[in-house]
Amino acid sequence: MTVSPPRAAPAVPSVSDTAYAAWAPDLQLLLGGEAAGPLRALIETASGELLSFCPRQVNHQPAQPGGGSSTIVQYGAQVRWAGGRVASETLVMATGGRIPRRAAVVDGDGVRVGIWRWPFDPDLPGLASAVDADTVSALLATLGMGGGKVRLTVRAYRPGRRAVIEASGTHGRVFLKVVRPHRVQALHAQHRLLARHMAVPHSYGYSTDGILVLQALHGGSLRGALSGPAVPLPGASALQGLLDQLPAELAQNQMSGDHLSRANHYADVVAGCLPDERVRLDELLGRYAFSEAGEHPTVAVHGDFYEGQILVERGRVSGLLDVDTAGSGHRIERVGDDARPPIRPRPAAPEGNRDLRTSAGLLLRLNSYRVVAGVLVAASRR
């Protein structure tokens, strides 16, 4: 049997051997040829044969004082099951603090590794139900939306964190957001609150194992509009207005995460994967250190406001997604993502849209320290 990649080498073609050698041991294991061992063991326990695998998504956190690094990697794999059927499967391995309490754990070359197969995510017990058509139909009927046949499409999956499943049927179209069970009730309340004030998906209800049933809004993502054929787009003032619609009650909630104060951490994340960029990252941090943030009021903020979270239709903003992190904060700190590389002009773009693409910073007059934070946040997500 041949399992790819066949040797201890980077499984990511764009990474040099020099960079790979500087990686933390867990990152080397999960993105190198040795990853085949734990993955093969997982599949064999389910009476399958691992034919090939390839890393598809990586989240790495560098070592912190008093602890080691942690990494979680999602793989696409080809598996031959009993009877000779070959299927595409999603497999996940995690190290350090990213290992779920209920995950199977193996020792991979001296590194403790948690491992599981989609949809049996130990931190998302509702996921298996959310991808079962009969179970989803029964849940929708319980919520008064009618039963009947449903068609399910996976839209997103962040291992251990969340998954989004589109469900279509006689009831129309809804989205199932799968989260950790202890978070689902508060997230349901958050959606109900925000939907009363702005175009945020209404929550129809939830299951106790972490499935939230959300309204489907019209429109496509601003990210897609920016990268596709030229279309009318909302101006920067419309994006500012979207933030202004956030209800004041959110300012009483827990402070949303502060990207600016974590700039050094984001730089360490990037350098941990791309050590050759350390000098350039330090230069960016040096510029950031000399910038003045000034004093700004605590207001309601989205918490993760960037073009992928904004829906647009016919040149207007039609919705705002992923309000999990909405809370109190300083809005000047929340728009660094809008300075990310995807926002740039296209040759055929209408003149009226160019400012939005080339300088989303006009939204709140971004200055250098926010651009630095945006670059670091963007790099850490890749």
Q: Where are the predicted features?
A:
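Active-site activation/catalytic loop segments of kinase-like enzymes and analogous catalytic loops
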Residues: 334-359, 368-382
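Active-site Asp-x-Gly
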Residues: 298-300, 313-351
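Phosphate/pyrophosphate-binding loops and the adjoining catalytic core of nucleotide-dependent enzymes
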Residues: 2-192, 197-199, 203-204, 208-210, ...
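Hydrophobic residue at the +6 position relative to the catalytic HRD Asp in the kinase catalytic loop
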Residues: 308-312
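An alpha-helical support segment within catalytic cores of ATP-dependent transferases
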Residues: 39-43, 134-155, 191, 249-303, ...
